[in-house]
C-alpha cells in the first residue's frame, strides 16, 4: 500500500487491486485556501461517514460516483479517476463569495440554480473561470463542460430533497469530477459540510464549515448533529 497523494483533508493510497484506491480522511480543517488551519479530533471520521452516506444516497438516485464502499470510520474504497482540475459550484441561495463579487444580498434566493467553475490552482487562489477559459486551458471540451453542468444540476436536485427531509436548506455546494480510463465522467472527492453551505430552515443556523470560518460555533458538534440527522433518515 503506497501513499499516492496527500491533500488538505485526505490521503489517497494504492491497494492490491488495480481498479481500487483507499481514501483516508484526515482530522485537519482549513479555511481560506489554508490561511486558517487546525487539527480537530473526529473531523475525519465525521466527513468520511457523511460522505459515504450521501454518495450511497446519490447512487440510489441514479448519480454515479467513484465511491465503492466505506471501509472504516475514517476510510473508504473508491474507483481511480483522473480529477478534472475544476471546482464545480452550484448555488441556490446567495451567500459567501458571490455576495461580495456581484452584490447579491446574503440569503437572496436565485430564480434558477447557478453553476460556476473555479480553476483548481492553489498558486492562483482557485479563480472563477468561464467556459472559454476552460477550453483555452485545455481542461475540458465543450461536451465535457455541458456534462459537468448537467450532472451538477442533477446532483443539486437530489441533494435538495435530502436536505429538505432534514428540515435544512441547501444554499450552495462545490463538487469535483474525474474521468475513468474509458473517459466516463464520475462524481469524485467528497460531499460533506466541508464542501456545502447548509442552513436550518427555521433559523438559518449553519450546519457547515462557516461555523469554523466565522468562529460562530463548534465544528465537531455541528458536523455530529448533521450526521445524526442523516442517520435518522435511514
UniProtKB/Swiss-Prot annotation:
Pfam families from the UniProt entry = SAICAR_synt
Q: In which pathway does it act?
A: Purine metabolism; IMP biosynthesis via de novo pathway; 5-amino-1-(5-phospho-D-ribosyl)imidazole-4-carboxamide from 5-amino-1-(5-phospho-D-ribosyl)imidazole-4-carboxylate: step 1/2
Q: Highest taxon of the source?
A: Bacteria
Listed A to Z, the keywords are: ATP-binding, Ligase, Nucleotide-binding, Purine biosynthesis
What InterPro entries does the entry give?
SAICAR_synt/ADE2_N, SAICAR_synt_PurC, SAICAR_synth, SAICAR_synthetase, SAICAR_synthetase_CS
Q: Which terms in the Gene Ontology molecular function aspect does this entry carry? A: ATP binding; phosphoribosylaminoimidazolesuccinocarboxamide synthase activity
**Residues annotated as signal peptide:** none
GO BP terms, alphabetized: 'de novo' IMP biosynthetic process; cobalamin biosynthetic process
Q: What Enzyme Commission number does this protein have?
A: 6.3.2.6
Is Phosphoprotein there in the keyword field? no
Catalytic activity, reaction form: 5-amino-1-(5-phospho-D-ribosyl)imidazole-4-carboxylate + L-aspartate + ATP = (2S)-2-[5-amino-1-(5-phospho-beta-D-ribosyl)imidazole-4-carboxamido]succinate + ADP + phosphate + 2 H(+)
CDD domains, per this entry? SAICAR_synt_PurC (cd01415)
Tell me yes or no: is Nucleotide-binding among this UniProt entry's keywords: yes
Hey, which family's this protein in? Belongs to the SAICAR synthetase family.
Q: Which HAMAP family match?
A: SAICAR_synth
| Protein name, as recorded | Phosphoribosylaminoimidazole-succinocarboxamide synthase
Amino acid at each position: 500500500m503506497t501513499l499516492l497523494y496527500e491533500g488538505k483533508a485526505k490521503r489517497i493510497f494504492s491497494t492490491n487491486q488495480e481498479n481500487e484506491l483507499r481514501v483516508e480522511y484526515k482530522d485537519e480543517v482549513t479555511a481560506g485556501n489554508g490561511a486558517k488551519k487546525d487539527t480537530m479530533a473526529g473531523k475525519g471520521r465525521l466527513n468520511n461517514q457523511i460522505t459515504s452516506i450521501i454518495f450511497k444516497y446519490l447512487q440510489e438516485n441514479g448519480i454515479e460516483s467513484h465511491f465503492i464502499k466505506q471501509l472504516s470510520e475514517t476510510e473508504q474504497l473508491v474507483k481511480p479517476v483522473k480529477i478534472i482540475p475544476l471546482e464545480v459550484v452550484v448555488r441556490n441561495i446567495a451567500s459567501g463569495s458571490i455576495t461580495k463579487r456581484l452584490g447579491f444580498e446574503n440569503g437572496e434566493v436565485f430564480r434558477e440554480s447557478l453553476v460556476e467553475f473555479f480553476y483548481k490552482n492553489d498558486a492562483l487562489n482557485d479563480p472563477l473561470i468561464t467556459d472559454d477559459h476552460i477550453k483555452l486551458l485545455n481542461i475540458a471540451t465543450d461536451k465535457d463542460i455541458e456534462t459537468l453542468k448537467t450532472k451538477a444540476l442533477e446532483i443539486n436536485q437530489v441533494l435538495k430533497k435530502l436536505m429538505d427531509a432534514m428540515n435544512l436548506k441547501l444554499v450552495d455546494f462545490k463538487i469535483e469530477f474525474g474521468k475513468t480510463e474509458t473517459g466516463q465522467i464520475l462524481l469524485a472527492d467528497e460531499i460533506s459540510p466541508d464542501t456545502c453551505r447548509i442552513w436550518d430552515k427555521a433559523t438559518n443556523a449553519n450546519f457547515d464549515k462557516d461555523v469554523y470560518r466565522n468562529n460562530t460555533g463548534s465544528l465537531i458538534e455541528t458536523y455530529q448533529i448533521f450526521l445524526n440527522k442523516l442517520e435518522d433518515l435511514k
